[in-house]
Swiss-Prot record:
GO terms for cellular component: extracellular region. Belongs to the polysaccharide lyase 4 family. PANTHER family: RHAMNOGALACTURONATE LYASE-RELATED. Disulfide bonds join C50-C93, C184-C193. It is found in: Secreted. This is Probable rhamnogalacturonate lyase A. Its main location: secreted. Residues 1-20 form the signal peptide. It comes from Aspergillus niger (strain ATCC MYA-4892 / CBS 513.88 / FGSC A1513). The keyword Cell wall biogenesis/degradation applies. One of its GO terms (biological process) is cell wall organization. Keywords: Carbohydrate metabolism, Cell wall biogenesis/degradation, Disulfide bond, Lyase, Polysaccharide degradation, Secreted, Signal. Pfam families: CBM-like, fn3_3, RhgB_N. One of its GO terms (molecular function) is carbohydrate binding.
């Protein structure tokens, strides 16, 4: 329900282009912030809860009337203040363990935000959610209807739905952090985008992904997930998350190049200015140049990353001082790790080199890129459930080395769906010695891991992988710890001529269909030992 203050804001801006002065109107229960932007932006913040209860952009109310926009699931109660200093307005919402900042610059249709925490919120995740009017803003960008679950029938938990014959979920809106600088919801006359300026205190690394948007019918949600337990590989980081910016425009999509260095002058807890940071520059070398190369730095307090140039040169983002683990990826596969120390006000030189060593291979299925790219259904898995009718048949399948296509091998093997997968290959007489079957995976669920049988020889059962306690493949995730399993194949097991390998899923757990124990593939290699 719109408050009296919200209704007055709406009426006063009905013309859409008439702006009052930049400033704050203080009411008994709210602050009304006028950005004085050309396409007017006026929003209302509840003084008791920190909820945004009204957002009027160009004369139209964008905020959902039933529930506010806020950090987490709402702070409940907070100490809320609003101050104006020159060209900036800052709203500060404080609890014992969290401070939420909202900053507006005179003339800009942007709500800049940052979130400072000393403890993880009790709900177990840290997010900002804007609940916006789905009648005015029905669309989601850039992936469209894959996360529009309005009028859907739940088919898995409370977050995967069937809509008009298609499986959809809010998780299918995700994008890798390294590639996600902007995601939006939009309508014919308005667009609202989340611009992500800083991931340093988030968790998961460059290839982590999380929910970005979800039109659930009553309202369209625009998110920024700073951390969560959604296939999470790291501990949560405390401190300042952000800045991140909610940008309001009409037909145009805003640039991601937003300067938020003014935060240094606004007494934002935990903010580290450019002058207090350093960089790392160098050259990466050795990996397969057919893949993107990424360099990643992390410690308990911060994380950063960058793509290298085609020649391997790189410069990091501006980093907080400290000692970092430095990782070099071929695609998403780790080929080297090192350590580097960053000092404020200086650039550190640090090269890194690494490659994938596999020995003399008899065959290889897939690539050492840390992803299931190219395997059957990999092209659809990010945006739909494995049960979707648009998916190709999962099998069980047989892959014949030399004649099958990569799409004849499934991107995931499920204990109750398509286990085992069969591989057939032909060996020459000089390929019958001792060998290693190396199975590269990206993610497991419910303890699922591979057990291989080569002709009549059954490889040993590997120990259970680390349990992430999170659904993965059914929610559009594929990246976990990237476990690699080596199966020692005794001399004479491989015979001259035709050979057969079966790969089965083993686990002490069970489940139905696509929630049965499973693992996702990256590469299968059989290589001769010391040949």
């Amino acid at each position: 329900m719109l408050s009296k203050t919200s209704l007055l804001s709406l009426l006063s801006l009905a013309a859409g282009v008439v702006n009052a002065d930049f400033g704050i109107t203080t009411n008994d229960d709210s602050y009304v912030i006028n950005a004085n932007s050309p396409n007017s932006l006026v929003f209302t913040v509840d003084r008791g809860s920190c909820d945004i209860t009204s957002i009027v952009h160009y004369g139209t109310e964008l905020q959902y009337s039933g529930k506010g926009s806020h950090i987490g699931s709402g702070l409940g109660t907070a100490t809320v203040s609003a101050t104006k200093s020159g060209d900036y307005i800052k709203v500060t919402c404080e609890t014992d363990t969290l401070t939420q900042y909202m900053v507006v610059h005179d003339g800009d249709p942007i709500i800049h935000m940052a979130t400072y925490i000393t403890e993880e919120p009790s709900i177990g995740e840290l997010r900002f959610i804007a609940r916006l009017n789905s009648d005015v803003l029905p669309n989601e960008e850039p992936f469209g209807d894959v996360s529009n679950t309005a009028d859907g029938e739940a088919i898995e938990g409370s977050d995967v739905f069937l809509v008009d014959g298609e499986t959809r979920s809010k998780f299918y809106s995700s994008q890798r952090f390294i590639d996600d600088q902007r995601h939006c919801i939009a309508g014919d006359e308005h667009r609202v985008c989340m611009i992500l300026n800083q991931y340093e205190t988030s968790s998961g690394g460059p290839f982590h992904r999380d929910i970005n948007s979800n039109n659930g019918g009553d309202y369209n949600s625009l998110y920024w997930y700073m951390n969560s337990g959604h296939v999470q590989l790291e501990s949560y980081r405390m401190g300042l998350h952000g800045p991140y910016s909610m940008y309001f425009s009409r037909s145009g999509t805003p640039s991601t190049d937003i300067d938020t260095s003014f935060f240094a002058d606004l007494d934002i807890e935990g903010y580290v200015a450019e002058s207090g940071r350093g960089t790392v520059s160098g050259t990466a070398s050795g990996a397969d140049s057919s893949f993107d190369w990424v360099v990643h730095w992390y410690n308990d307090d911060a994380q950063y990353w960058t793509y290298t140039s085609s020649s391997g040169s790189f410069t990091s983002p501006a980093m907080k001082p400290g000692t970092y683990t430095m990782v070099y990826y071929q695609g998403e596969y780790v080929v080297a790790t090192s350590e580097v120390t960053v000092s404020a006000g200086s650039s550190t030189s640090k090269d890194i080199s690494g490659s994938v060593e596999t020995g003399t291979t008899i065959f290889k299925i897939g690539d050492w890129d840390g992803q299931p790219t190219g395997f059957r259904n990999a092209e659809n898995q990010l945006r739909m459930h494995p049960s979707d009718s648009r998916m190709s048949d999962w099998g069980p399948l047989t892959y014949t080395v030399g004649s099958s296509s990569l799409t004849d091998f499934p991107m995931a093997i499920f204990k109750s769906v398509n286990s085992p997968v069969t591989i057939k290959f032909t060996a020459t007489s000089d390929q019958t010695g001792a060998a290693t079957l190396r199975i590269g995976t990206t993610l497991s669920f419910a303890g699922g891991r591979p057990q291989a049988t080569i002709n009549d020889y059954e490889g040993s059962a590997p120990s259970a992988p680390t349990n992430l306690d999170s659904r993965g493949v059914t929610r559009g995730a594929y990246r976990g710890y990237g476990d690699v399993y080596d199966v020692s194949v005794p001399e004479g097991t491989i015979v001259e001529g035709e050979n057969t390998i079966t790969i089965s899923v083993i686990s002490g757990s069970s489940g139905d269909d696509f929630l049965s124990p499973n693992f996702l593939d990256a590469v299968f290699i059989i290589a001769l030992v010391d040949n």
